[in-house]
Curated annotation (Swiss-Prot):
Family recorded in the similarity comment: Belongs to the complex I subunit 1 family.
Gene name as annotated: nuoH
Enzyme class: translocase
Subcellular location: Cell inner membrane
Species of origin: Erwinia tasmaniensis (strain DSM 17950 / CFBP 7177 / CIP 109463 / NCPPB 4357 / Et1/99)
Protein name as catalogued: NADH-quinone oxidoreductase subunit H
């Protein structure tokens, strides 16, 4: 066929990759939302959702149908364009970051030489969804949530990036495949344990998950920045949160736990098992930890996490210089 040129084939492959990433990541996030509700019920000694389907297995479908048929109402006092744009950014920002995560040595959306920088850019973009939602809603609780999000992001984005610089220094590259290959003999979690801890903390904060969910604290801000959202717009915020958890969990596996590497089992299975473990850790953190005060969250970021990150970076630089001599 004359129209099937190499350029057209490249476009078709890119579209197929994008659709696969979309359906797989959103499907994992949807499964996690159901698993979270069941596990929280187990942790809190209650049943959890168990009415729709066998063992509550169709509860997610029922929730999606309910959300789909709810009125897509936009308050008259909002900025309609920004109000509509905010949930789209929340859904797509960390979903795009998943494109740079290699599932195996050949399965990935995009093999970028600046892959890690692309993730940091998308993580910084995600906060604009919260800012747009809080500002455009013209609601004092939404605006307070947006202000909290901007200040919290300013604090935690600093050591989110610095916690990864030790990994980059050891691998000598921002490319995700190169970082995984550099862990063939020793996973980065051992020499970069402080970087691993601070990246996990910053990852929870980037996803606005408990205990760093101050921008949407129900007891203080009545659900915060998405108080005026309903229907599918609220659904995009909801799904975007779980997409962020999947992306951060996959990045933890790639950067610190050898990615797809492991004995006996196929690489895809190893990657899926490791990622699922850290997704479950997000749920356990929500069940086990209380929500601290907002000033305590900010102090913890600047006074504890940032010094630990700088200490890890200095130690990594010293080791690299010593071994190079």
């Amino acid at each position: 066929m004359s129209w099937l040129t190499p350029e057209v084939i490249d476009v078709i492959i890119a579209v197929v990759k994008a659709l696969v990433i979309l359906f797989v990541v959103v499907g994992c996030g949807a499964f996690m939302s159901f698993g979270e509700r069941r596990l929280l019920g187990l942790f809190q000694n209650r049943y959890g959702p168990n009415r729709v389907g066998w063992g509550g297995s169709l509860q997610l479908v029922a929730d999606m149908i309910k959300m789909f048929f709810k009125e897509d109402w936009i308050p008259p006092f909002t900025d309609r364009v920004i109000f509509t744009l905010a949930p789209m950014i929340a859904f797509t920002s960390l979903l795009l970051a998943m494109a740079i995560v290699p599932v195996t040595s050949t399965w990935m959306g995009a093999d970028l030489n600046i892959g890690l920088l692309f993730f940091l850019m998308m993580a910084g973009l995600a906060v604009y969804a919260v800012l747009f939602a809080g500002w455009s809603s013209n609601n004092k609780y939404s605006l307070l949530g947006a202000m909290r999000a901007s200040a919290q992001t300013l604090s935690y984005e600093v050591f989110l990036g610095l916690s990864l610089m030790g990994v980059v220094a050891q691998a000598g590259s921002f490319n995700m495949v190169d970082i995984v290959n550099s862990q063939a003999h020793l996973w980065n979690v051992i020499p970069q344990f402080l970087g691993f801890l601070t990246f996990c903390i910053a990852g929870v904060a980037v996803c606005h998950r408990h205990p760093f969910d101050q921008p949407e604290a129900e007891q203080e801000l009545a659900d915060g920045y998405h108080i005026e959202y309903a229907g599918m717009k609220f659904g995009l915020f909801f799904v975007g949160e779980y997409v962020g958890i999947v992306t951060v969990s996959a990045l933890i596996v790639t950067l610190f736990f050898g990615g797809w590497q492991g004995p006996w089992l196929p690489p895809v299975i190893w990657f899926a098992l490791k990622t699922a473990f850290f997704m479950m850790m997000f749920i356990l953190i929500r069940a086990a930890l209380p929500r601290p005060r907002y000033d305590q969250v900010m102090s913890f970021g600047w006074k504890v996490c940032l010094p630990l990150t700088l200490l890890n970076l200095l130690a990594t630089a010293a080791v690299i210089l010593y071994t190079a001599q």
